[in-house]
Amino acid sequence: IFFMEQTKSLIEAIIQGIQEKKGKEITTVDLHHIVTAPCSCFVICTCGSPQQVSAVCDSVEEFTRKLVQQKPSAIAGRQNGLWVAMDYGTVMVHIFLEEARGYYELEKLWDDAELTQYPDID
């Protein structure tokens, strides 16, 4: 995946934050070459409960603040526990409850996007 160093470090911090709270099915969607895409990359993960969605969101915030000194410009959906979207400018984080991820299938929106899957950590 081609990303500027700063974006790469941000993605790594996001993934660590997700893994810290046992987020599953972590996938990055490389959108940097797609003109109509809203950002360079999506980081998507699945959670088993609304409480875990919230915990992963908090963890991602903590890890990005500590490791790369970045805060999201916006966080949407925090109250509902189904789908939280975190906007880091070049990177958007999508934290889904299992049913919501299956329903929205964000990974499939761009056919020519490169997907990278990360192993689940137990």
Describe the residue ranges of each PLM region.
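Conserved acidic residues
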Residues: S40, T90
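Glycine/threonine-rich flexible loop motifs
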Residues: Y103-Y104
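Active-site beta-strand termini and strand-to-loop segments that position acidic
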Residues: M86-Y88
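Polybasic/polar functional segments that serve as interface/processing modules
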Residues: F2-C39, C47-V84, E98-A100, L109-D122
